Amino acid sequence: MDYSEIMVRHGELSTKGKNRMRFINKLKNNIQDVLAPFPAITVRSDRDRTHVSLNGTDYQPIVEALKLVFGVQALSPVYKLEKSVPLLVTAVQDIMTSLYRDGLTFKIATKRSDHAFELDSRELNSLLGGAVFEVLPNIQAQMKHPDVTLKVEIRDEAAYISYEEIKGAGGLPVGTSGKGMLMLSGGIDSPVAGYLALKRGLDIEVVHFASPPYTSPGALAKAQDLTRRLTRFGGNIQFIEVPFTEIQEEIKNKAPEAYLMTLTRRFMMRITDAIREQRKGLVIVNGESLGQVASQTLESMQAINAVTSTPIIRPVVTMDKLEIIEMAQAIDTFDISIQPFEDCCTIFAPDRPKTNPKLGNAEKYEERFDIDGLVQRAVSGIVVTEITPEIVNDEVENLIDALL
């Protein structure tokens, strides 16, 4: 027998009361986005489950994709069949025969939500257990901690049989907690911050600053590859490329070296906030970790934050670098993050950046700039690209291949 579908069990969604179906429908849409590379797949949801019909598609890559989607508590490959006692008996016998080995223990666990079905749960457990003994007389039944728990569900539309329960990613479906702008540089920390924001249901749009010719096409492709990795957790992501060359050259030419980083980050924050307002986001997310670098001391954060009243979420702020690296490796962004492409935060980095910049000094130096004009030109020059989970070679790999 081949699996018919993957049955998805919802996580925290069961606690959402009147909003439950809104959360479930969002999860369904996210699953459809993530599984877009598999055109034969169909997805439907009810209040208790989401059903991913395989329609002949190999189940293993579907399971691997679904395990990453936030809002999924658990999933099971299942056999779907008509609600017929003879069909159930044959299916249970075939499945257990395929799983049998010496010493194997099992139990049948039946759940009947269709109360019009001819047998109740207790009767089905007895009948199907007896059917297993008919073909496997040496198998042992065990009610506590058996090797195999064969779950049989009798629902209104069909019967379902499964024996695997695979842990999902948990969290909330992406998009159920509003929208935020993720400042993604291309380093290790910001993709991890994005992952953690996605886990709590935040719909992120990625803001990436590019300063050609100081930053290369490879740096841009790297940021897009990182964004593509994040689409595995909740579907498509809007990637916003911000032209930043003019501003960086202005800062380099007119500001004291010690304040280059502070002023650069203040402009980035202003621009991100303007994009957030334009695109109806609610928060800004970044990968700052307290004390990790000069721009991430409390004094620096205070001086940079002063340009906006928008909430700033810093998911990795209390994490050690090694903890962030471990998470980056777990979500498969680390190898991309360490590719040796420059970013806007490093190209004009001073040898001795100010670790305790004074807000008054930053504001005084900014009097040398046409702040509104610079921000407006940057925002008007953004390029928005929708990044999807399609199975393609990484952009950076394509670029390297082209060069070779």
Swiss-Prot record:
Pfam families from the UniProt entry: ThiI, ThiI_fer, THUMP
Residues of the THUMP domain: 60-165
Pathway: Cofactor biosynthesis; thiamine diphosphate biosynthesis
GO MF assignments: ATP binding; CCA tRNA nucleotidyltransferase activity; tRNA binding; tRNA-uracil-4 sulfurtransferase activity
Annotated residues for binding of ATP: 183-184, 208-209, 265, 287, 296
PANTHER family in UniProt: TRNA SULFURTRANSFERASE
NCBIfam families named in the record: tRNA uracil 4-sulfurtransferase ThiI
Biological role stated in the UniProt entry: Catalyzes the ATP-dependent transfer of a sulfur to tRNA to produce 4-thiouridine in position 8 of tRNAs, which functions as a near-UV photosensor. Also catalyzes the transfer of sulfur to the sulfur carrier protein ThiS, forming ThiS-thiocarboxylate. This is a step in the synthesis of thiazole, in the thiamine biosynthesis pathway. The sulfur is donated as persulfide by IscS.
Protein name (record): Probable tRNA sulfurtransferase
